[in-house]
């Protein structure tokens, strides 16, 4: 991005944050958040969720952070909670999809946003 492009994006984000969302956008946002949270919880019982949780606990340890891992009783450092949550959310591919972009934004964005939101007082 050029500086001009960065400034345009920054200005748009600053203005968007202050504006109310249209109700249909707010409803779609709620549905995507709930869908991703459900995928994070159900994914904890699947191989990818179990392995991610085991991996982060092998060096981070439980109870050493300020971010929860949905679907478990664990509290982890935010980066580890986001990683393990993202792995679980995508474990059985029930997470959301952006058809035009052919990607799953929720499994990366929602766990990270939740971890940061819990970490920041």
Model regions and ranges:
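N-terminal core-entry segment
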Residues: 1-121
